[in-house]
Amino acid sequence: MKKIFIALIALFSVGVSAQQPFSGIRSSSYLGVQSTLSNPANIVASSKKWDVNLLSFQVNFANNATDLKLSSVKDDLFKLENDKISGVINADVLGPSFMVGGSKFAFALTSRARVFAHLNNLNTHLFKALSENKLTENYVLQSPENQGVTANGWSEIGGTFSMVLFQDLNHVIKAGVTAKLLQGFTSSYVQINGLKDAKIEIDGNEVYLSNANAGVVMLNSGVDFTNLKNVSDITKSYGKGIGFDLGLVYERQLESADDWCPNCGIGRGYRYKIGVSLLDIGGIKYSSNPQNSFQYLLNVPAGKRFRLDNLGDNLTQIQENLKKSEYVKTGGISDSYKASLPTSLNLIFDYYAGSRFFVEFASQFNLVSKEDSAKNAYYANSYSLTPRFEGKYFGFYLPLNYSDLSKFNAGVALRMGPLFVGSGSALSVLTNKSKQADVYFGLRFGL
């Protein structure tokens, strides 16, 4: 058991999403095919006739408990004062992709891979008892919520079509849709529920649980990253599904040609733009791996004790020891299950102030229900304000973000010709006052 929880610590101690993907740079009018990720309607009647993405990626780590200091993040994150901790690691890679734009219609083809790992409401006293045996006094758990760990990884092949629905001298309305073929390569979750008022008791070097009526569920499908023997296993399909992105954009054209906004789109360009998109509709169906999937019902009456600190160092040992206990019964496991995509509603308002200066307000709202979050990927609700300066070959971006998970962060991004690099939290990380760390990079070209 200790080795499993040490692996969990390693997962959430790396300085690798609470916020919107590619925060800051996603507001650019020059991204081309990359702009389909936030709204598939963006590419029609835009500044790009064609665009090719060679490689873009982002890694992001966020938590609700502690500011990130690389020298002490593990100890700070899991200290007992935090009580309940939640966190997320997200990696997003946009592979070779291209778009062809036009004044009425536009098309794009994208390849993408994404990984989410979530830590949900983990009680730090229970964590310490199972992983490190460092508790010095008895403790009554106050954990009405489900707690656990979730990991999902999948690849996407997407086709985007967008068109102008209406256009006159002052107004443009655009719509777009992306259909995605999904291939899942890993899905795992461990969930513990029903531990409210359960008691952790310390007896010398031994740790016991009493007065507990709880359930423990683990479902696993696809690549086992704790025992990965062949990297090529990641390219195999362990689950399949279909997903969709839907988008709508309204642009209010500039009042006169004298105020013309270069490369803001068709006509004179826009004074402001309003975008609404519903992203990541759909999910992936997996078959459960019977060797690594189980459900146990734990019932330890008051006055009785169940030992926690010697369950074992791997899943096989843990399952064998649980089955031997008089307080544990085995439950049934579904042969298959569905993991939802991180469905979200995205809203943006982008205003052109003149002289190549813009400011964008964007918000992202999670639409994945908390009841289903045990096995699903999801984003935290977030809001951002991004002032930016944009020329044809250079752009500077200053994203200011707030999320339900990691609170306030400030970042910076640069676009220089075909290259862009940035972070939604770099400025906050430099002050050691950030619960989030992220970085992104991209290489693309177009006309």
Question: For the regions a protein language model found, what residue spans apply to each?
Answer:
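Sec/Tat signal peptide C-region and signal peptidase I cleavage site
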Residues: V14-A18
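Subset of outer-membrane beta-barrel
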Residues: Q19-L447
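Sec-dependent N-terminal signal peptides
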Residues: I4-S13
